[in-house]
Amino acid sequence: MGKRLLVQRRGRGGSVFRNPGWKRLGPARYPPYNPEEFKNKVLVGVVKDLLHEPGRGAPLALVEFEDGTKMYMIPPEGLAVGQKIYYGAKAPAVLGSIVEIGNVPEGTIVSNIEIRPGDGGKLARSSGAYALVLAHSNGKTLIQLPSKKVKEVSSEARATIGMVAAGGRIEKPMLKAGKMWHWSRAKSFKYPTVRGKAMSAYAHPAGGGHHPKGLTPAPRNAPPGRKVGHIAPRRTGRKKGASRTPTQ
């Protein structure tokens, strides 16, 4: 009797593939957007703690504001416990301040940027990421993303001054398979991944050694367990005669 393929097990959604959401601290979002309050008031908050959330590359900062509200924020590089931050459209543009991006001077580094006011922050959120404010025009702000692409966002969108902490994290190599296993487990990835043709015949259609390596194309209506490899391809194999050099 054969075994279910990895894609079948993943689709079933067993405990191995289920996202360990109970380990998460909470969403790293800005407070609910109140235009009147955000534009006319400046709240002062204090960083109570810097925390690690399994599965997240950047740390999280627990911030408590003077009105008693708390939130988890993605901290910029250099933010420390006990440091004050400011929340408001007209807040001073200092490290950690959450401001309206339309009021940020051109050339400033920002992170955790909203595309539309109130969406909680969508851009430049991973460790070491930042965007550069390029220009303001007609209620829109041009920013340069980490990919060097220039994007237009609403000038009323919120952003954090500074670059996200934990930059250079991916430069450190894993070195051991065990490190990769723990990292994958925190993100609910299946590791290690075994090639189908390296398996036994009962575990995968491409497994076993009694037939040549590789598979025939699978039709679109193939049953689960057979639908692997080339699925309803237009063609397979090497394209012959495509790369001929033109003659003089």
UniProtKB/Swiss-Prot annotation:
Annotated GO biological process: cytoplasmic translation
Alphabetical list of SUPFAM superfamilies matching this protein: Nucleic acid-binding proteins (SSF50249), Translation proteins SH3-like domain (SSF50104)
Keywords: Ribonucleoprotein, Ribosomal protein, RNA-binding, rRNA-binding
Record-linked Pfam families: Ribosomal_L2, Ribosomal_L2_C
Function: One of the primary rRNA binding proteins. Required for association of the 30S and 50S subunits to form the 70S ribosome, for tRNA binding and peptide bond formation. It has been suggested to have peptidyltransferase activity; this is somewhat controversial. Makes several contacts with the 16S rRNA in the 70S ribosome.
Annotated family: Belongs to the universal ribosomal protein uL2 family.
HAMAP family: Ribosomal_uL2_A
Protein name: Large ribosomal subunit protein uL2
